[in-house]
């Protein structure tokens, strides 16, 4: 249990969710510190800015009293601090269980789904924050705790069924599209986790109406609402106009036109994400003009279509690593930069996922003007596999595998839209390329 008289020590504090949670608890008046690998990660910047200690792993960090230990999901007994807890008889609590403590203190809204969680959570937090004090936990390393909050908005990760620790008032489910083949047995096993999460939702479940798996999910207690583009949806987006500045659209609820809304986000998926946010706000009785203000204010999450200009060259960084996410990112780039050639640098993420979706990756990357792939990014669980990036590139006309030794080949595409996509260390390639552009 969280305790303000004790230090809250995070094992793995630089993980995206852990960093967000540490920031929230710090804002709420807890004494927060933690440890992680020494290698730089972008999540440490807000931690350091908040004055939160980030130490190296050491058994000496674990005290026999005076601490509440929060353990990151990735760390097992082979971690020196987890081992120290076991040796000293010090109990720890998991990241999901700690988040659940916060969930129960406020009107809570979880955002689940195979794709779109981070962007939708950020958008929802911004909109609700315009209406009332709102704490939030976002999977891009950002978190904020606001005392006397009315709302708590959080990203609910389905991996290893972590989100089943939560019992929110409301939940958005953006889609159910098979992922994490290293853990889930098959598509039915994956979907069953979302059914359980729906059963644990108390008041309202908001699902994308076009998703076949979500159509089959029926919560035990909460009322189910659909959002989408169809007349049959409870919250229907219509008269959608997409431009190089974003999108404008109307939303209909119970036959009533709620008026026009504007977002400075790109791609069909973001219209759907915004409609889900509008549905939550409408259900909670929030003034729609306040909702409009929040929608316009939000410009995106970290590593979600993050855009930089280098003269006439546009560089975009995106977390996309699942086929559905690649499609959405490519569509968004085409929408915003219709007159530029589209060059993609994709880093496949984990061998099991790459093998599972090989055919889809080939199909998608055939649709860009020039496709590059970096070597596959493995994981602690999968250090090697029986597929490599060359296997994908060989099936795509003109595609190449790129690494740091031939990264300069990208300079031939100055003036184009260059998109780096992946969930591993693809930002290292982007930074190296940007340094070349700056010379």
From Swiss-Prot:
Gene3D superfamilies xref list: Mur ligase, C-terminal domain, Mur-like, catalytic domain, NAD(P)-binding Rossmann-like Domain
Functional pathway: Cell wall biogenesis; peptidoglycan biosynthesis
Assigned protein family: Belongs to the MurCDEF family.
Keywords from the named record: ATP-binding, Cell cycle, Cell division, Cell shape, Cell wall biogenesis/degradation, Cytoplasm, Ligase, Nucleotide-binding, Peptidoglycan synthesis
Name of this chain's protein: UDP-N-acetylmuramate--L-alanine ligase
Reaction(s) the record says it catalyses: UDP-N-acetyl-alpha-D-muramate + L-alanine + ATP = UDP-N-acetyl-alpha-D-muramoyl-L-alanine + ADP + phosphate + H(+)
NCBIfam families: murC
SUPFAM superfamilies according to UniProt: MurCD N-terminal domain, MurD-like peptide ligases, catalytic domain, MurD-like peptide ligases, peptide-binding domain
Coiled-coil stretches: none
Pfam families: Mur_ligase, Mur_ligase_C, Mur_ligase_M
E.C. numbers: 6.3.2.8
Principal EC category: ligase
MF term (GO), any: UDP-N-acetylmuramate-L-alanine ligase activity
Residues bound to ATP: 113-119
GO cellular component, one term: cytoplasm
């Amino acid at each position: 249990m969280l305790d303000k008289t004790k230090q809250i020590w995070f094992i793995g504090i630089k993980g995206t969710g852990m960093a967000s949670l540490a920031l929230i608890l710090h804002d709420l008046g807890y004494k927060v510190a933690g440890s992680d690998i020494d290698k730089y990660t972008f999540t440490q910047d807000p931690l350091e800015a908040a004055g939160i200690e980030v130490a190296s792993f050491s058994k000496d960090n674990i005290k026999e009293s005076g601490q509440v230990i929060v353990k990151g999901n990735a760390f097992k007994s082979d971690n020196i601090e987890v081992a120290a807890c076991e040796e000293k008889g010090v109990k720890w609590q998991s990241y999901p269980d700690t988040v659940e403590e916060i969930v129960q203190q406020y009107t809570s809204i979880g955002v689940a789904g195979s794709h779109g969680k981070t962007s939708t959570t950020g958008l929802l937090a911004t909109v609700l924050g315009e209406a009332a004090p709102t704490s939030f936990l976002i999977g891009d390393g950002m978190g904020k705790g606001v005392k006397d909050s009315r709302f708590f908005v959080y990203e609910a990760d389905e991996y290893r069924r972590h989100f089943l620790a939560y019992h929110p008032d409301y939940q958005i489910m953006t889609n159910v599209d098979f992922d994490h083949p290293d853990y889930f047995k098959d598509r039915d096993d994956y979907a069953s986790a979302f059914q359980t999460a729906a059963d644990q939702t108390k008041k309202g479940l908001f699902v994308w109406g076009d998703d076949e798996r979500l159509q089959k999910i029926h919560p035990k207690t909460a009322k189910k609402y659909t959002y989408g583009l169809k007349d049959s949806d409870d919250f229907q987006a219509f008269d959608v106009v997409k431009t190089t500045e974003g999108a404008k659209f109307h939303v209909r609820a119970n036959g009533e036109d709620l008026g026009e809304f504007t977002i400075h986000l790109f791609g069909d998926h973001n219209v759907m994400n915004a409609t889900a946010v509008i549905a939550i706000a409408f259900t909670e009785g929030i003034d729609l003009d306040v909702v409009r203000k929040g929608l316009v204010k939000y410009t995106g999450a970290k590593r979600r279509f993050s855009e930089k200009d280098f003269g006439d060259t546009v560089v975009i960084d995106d977390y996309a690593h699942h086929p559905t996410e690649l499609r959405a990112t490519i569509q968004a780039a085409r929408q915003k930069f219709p007159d530029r050639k589209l060059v993609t640098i994709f880093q496949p993420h984990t061998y099991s996922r790459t093998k599972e979706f090989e055919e889809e990756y080939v199909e998608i990357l055939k649709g860009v003007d020039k496709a590059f792939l970096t070597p596959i990014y493995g994981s602690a669980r999968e250090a090697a596999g029986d597929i490599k990036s060359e296997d994908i590139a060989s099936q795509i006309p003109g595609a190449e595998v790129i690494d740091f030794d031939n990264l300069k080949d990208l300079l031939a595409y100055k003036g184009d839209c260059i998109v780096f996509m992946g969930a591993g260390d693809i930002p290292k390639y982007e930074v190296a390329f940007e340094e070349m552009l700056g010379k």
